[in-house]
Amino acid sequence: MRVTLSDTALRHIALFEDVTGASAVDCLVDDDRVCFLVATGEMSDAIGPDGTTVEQVEERLDKRVSLVENADTAELFVANALAPAVVHNVTISENASTVAYAEVDRADTGVAIGRDGETIETARRLAERQFDIDDIELA
């Protein structure tokens, strides 16, 4: 699926790549937060030692930054998007709409949902943009 990025998102990606040396595939910009979809295998570069690199990005943008690692399959992508929650299995159901059902430990349900639902909402937005998944439900 082809994703269209706003000028703001493109500027944020350029800054992110300049500071971290990692590649960003997509970017979601909210009022107080930016989420970067990091190229597969480049998450350690994006985070940096003890999180110092991503902290530099947060300081430069004056916003909280979250990172999601890209994946080749929709199932792994959904699991990555819900991290740090432990996801045991993801099943994709294609009926009237495409829904990803993610099996998460009961103890990690709150982590997968995130504060005010922001983790699962970000996962839903990215999954729709990258894999045409209409919804993510926790099982």
Curated annotation (Swiss-Prot):
CDD domains for the chain: KH-II_NusA_arch_rpt1
One Pfam family recorded for the sequence: KH_5
SUPFAM superfamilies: Prokaryotic type KH domain (KH-domain type II) (SSF54814)
GO biological process: DNA-templated transcription termination; transcription antitermination
Secretion signal, residue range per the UniProt entry: none
Localization in the cell: Cytoplasm
Keywords: Cytoplasm, RNA-binding, Transcription, Transcription regulation, Transcription termination
One GO cellular component, as annotated: cytosol
InterPro entries per record: KH_dom-like_a/b, KH_dom_NusA-like, KH_sf_prok-type, NusA_arc, NusA_bac
Gene Ontology molecular function, alphabetical: RNA binding
KH domain location: 97-139
Domain of life of the native organism: Archaea
PANTHER family per UniProt: TRANSCRIPTION TERMINATION FACTOR NUSA (PTHR22648), TRANSCRIPTION TERMINATION_ANTITERMINATION PROTEIN NUSA (PTHR22648:SF0)
Similarity remark: Belongs to the NusA family.
Biological role stated in the UniProt entry: Participates in transcription termination.
Family annotation (NCBIfam families): nusA_arch (TIGR01952)
Protein name: Probable transcription termination protein NusA
Organism: Halococcus morrhuae
